[in-house]
Regions:
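Active-site loop segments of alpha/beta catalytic cores
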Residues: 21-25, 48
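Helix-start/capping segments and mature chain N-termini
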Residues: 2-3, 8, 12, 16, ...
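Extended, Lys/Arg-enriched charged tracts that mediate electrostatic binding to polyanionic substrates
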Residues: 24-39
Length: 252
């Protein structure tokens, strides 16, 4: 599929939002969700790349992602299925990645968990994402997040968090993190906070984790102060109540 030039995509989205401005909600923590996507249109049954495609942008008013406030989620480390592998499409927002995640999601839900913590597809030991989000951990005062190894999505919210954290003076390491390292940190008390990052939720705090019969609680099951600060800052920048020195927002 062709790559849409950034200036053309932004111009199109801007005009669409202006056209549909009556649908922009004004209540606290609500938003107009914008989703660009592209589909192949070749009228053929064979398996091959598309020569014709359509670029579409849809918008939809959405309510507060956390209507009752930020609540930490319980996550289950998935060591059977994988969402993507290096050399595949894990670094892209493709529908196939979601399809590969459904069975594990059902299994986690059946065990009382709300999200899946994905491991890599080769060694089945290194953490990659949580649900459909990037993931970060505060361990011994340092921020750790899986590196972009070809099967991890280079999320915009992830990038924004890294920028903010560095500006706040935190050391951020992008590297391989094993599930064993994470659980050892939780068990010895050095895992201070954990959260997912993504467009819809912005920040999703993690309160409990389960893996191979082990169960750990993060920060007493409460939202950490840094997790909350990231959420408040990002949402504040989106709403214009916090300064935006990075030029992340466009005022229409």
């Amino acid at each position: 599929l062709p790559q849409i030039p950034e200036d053309l995509a932004l111009a199109g989205i801007t005009e669409l939002v202006k056209l549909e401005q009556e649908w922009v909600p004004s209540a606290k923590d609500t938003s107009l969700y914008i989703r660009p996507f592209m589909v192949g249109l070749d009228a053929a049954l064979g398996v091959h790349s598309s020569h014709h495609c359509q670029y579409i942008v849809i918008v939809c008013p959405v309510g507060a992602y956390y209507p009752e406030g930020l609540d930490p989620v319980k996550i289950y480390v998935e060591d059977q299925d994988v969402r993507a592998v290096k050399g595949g499409t894990g670094m892209a927002k493709t529908g196939g990645n979601y399809a590969a995640s459904l069975r594990a999601g059902d299994r986690a839900e059946a065990n009382g968990y709300s999200q899946v913590l994905w491991l890599d597809g080769v060694h089945r030991k290194y953490i990659e994402e949580v649900g459909s989000m990037n993931v970060m951990f505060k361990i011994a005062g340092k921020i750790l997040t899986p590196d972009l190894n070809g099967s991890v999505l280079p999320g915009i919210t992830r990038r924004s968090c890294i920028q903010l954290l560095k500006d706040w003076g935190y050391e951020v390491e992008e590297r391989r993190i094993s599930a064993e390292e994470l659980f050892e940190a939780a068990e010895n008390g050095t895992l201070e906070e954990a959260w997912g990052t993504g467009t819809a939720a912005v920040i999703s705090p993690i309160g409990e984790m389960g893996w191979e019969g082990r169960h750990v609680v993060v920060n007493g099951g409460e939202i950490g102060s840094l997790t909350h600060k990231l959420y408040d800052t990002l949402v504040g920048i989106q709403w214009g109540t916090e300064p935006d020195p990075y030029g992340w927002t466009i005022q229409l």
